[in-house]
Amino acid sequence: MQFGIVAAIADGGRTARAGGSVRPPRRPPASHTAWGLPRGRPTGQPHATPTKSGPTSIAYVEVNNDQLANVGRYQLANGANAFDVAIIFAANINWNGSKAVLYNNENVQATLDDAATQIRPLQAKGIKVSLSILGNHQGAGIANFPTQAAAEDFAAQVSATVSKYGLDGVDLDDEYSDYGTNGTPQPNQQSIGWLISALRADVPGKLISFYDIGPASSALSSSSSTIGSKLDYAWNPYYGTYSAPSIPGLDKSRLSAAAVDVQNTPQSTAVSLAQRTKADGYGVFMTYNLPDGDVSPYVSSMTKVLYGQAATYH
């Protein structure tokens, strides 16, 4: 992603990262389901879907450009879902002059409003749906809440949205905040921990994932394992690369060292990242930018390695 809501209105929320690197997503906690998913059941009434053995697959979707529902069209040979978690990219953290406020651009809002066709069908298949949140060039972000109360206020806004639209979780991304803009404070070491703790209290049983980048990443890397253990997943944020996050309280079963941009990472690189994920025993495999339409040859190149099965598009 490489823009906040200002850019998000035109761009949808997440593009290539600054400095030429293309950015990826985040991470997990407690008991896991048959798909390797953490605690809590998907919202809705999923059908009895065939299971698979292997890493939990993440699919970020730029809803400014593509349909979230497309995630559910990929199936393995035995009928299992190719992807386990679909992430709406992305809502924003705006600044209203006195505090951080959650903002959805028109495309994110349309996806939420059209839950009957964009979200519920995925959940009925056992695919969890999360909302990603990142900065919007207004000075507010997940790393600079000045007090615990401020973090709790924002967490309550997020929790209300998760509840209202029947979502399965939230994804945190420390990009495009432009800390200091509009007189906002600089990042601090406590902010991200306050937010994660407040979210875990507000949305028990829901997913909380972390796109491992920015000042929040630095703070988490030196934080108590008590904070990290409240996350469900974390992942490498640089597409086409392989590097696991280092967050106390999160073991490799809840991490993705791989980061794949489906529209930009060469297929051979995606295959190599899948092979390394399996060989090293990481429990999560993160992808970003799944487009509309059928890209099953690309998806299959990864699922054959991760699950020993090709993926088809239905």
Swiss-Prot record:
Family annotation (InterPro entries): Endo-Fsp, Endoglyc_H, Glyco_hydro18_cat, Glyco_hydro_18_chit_AS, Glycoside_hydrolase_SF
SUPFAM superfamilies (alphabetical): (Trans)glycosidases (SSF51445)
UniProt GO cellular component terms: extracellular region
EC number(s) stated in the UniProt entry for this protein: 3.2.1.96
Gene Ontology biological process terms from the UniProt entry: carbohydrate metabolic process
Record field: pH dependence: Optimum pH is 5.0-9.0.
Annotated GH18 domain residues: 55-309
Localization (cell): Secreted
Active site location: 175 (proton donor)
UniProt KW keywords: Glycosidase, Hydrolase, Secreted, Signal
GO molecular function, one term: mannosyl-glycoprotein endo-beta-N-acetylglucosaminidase activity
Record's keyword annotation contains Hydrolase: yes
Catalytic activity line of the entry: an N(4)-(oligosaccharide-(1->3)-[oligosaccharide-(1->6)]-beta-D-Man-(1->4)-beta-D-GlcNAc-(1->4)-alpha-D-GlcNAc)-L-asparaginyl-[protein] + H2O = an oligosaccharide-(1->3)-[oligosaccharide-(1->6)]-beta-D-Man-(1->4)-D-GlcNAc + N(4)-(N-acetyl-beta-D-glucosaminyl)-L-asparaginyl-[protein]
Region described as Disordered: 14-54
Effect of residue 169 to L: Reduced catalytic activity
Functional summary from the UniProt entry: Cleaves asparagine-linked oligomannose and hybrid, but not complex, oligosaccharides from glycoproteins.
Subunit structure: Monomer.
Protein name: Endo-beta-N-acetylglucosaminidase
Taxonomic lineage from the root: Bacteria, Pseudomonadati, Bacteroidota, Flavobacteriia, Flavobacteriales
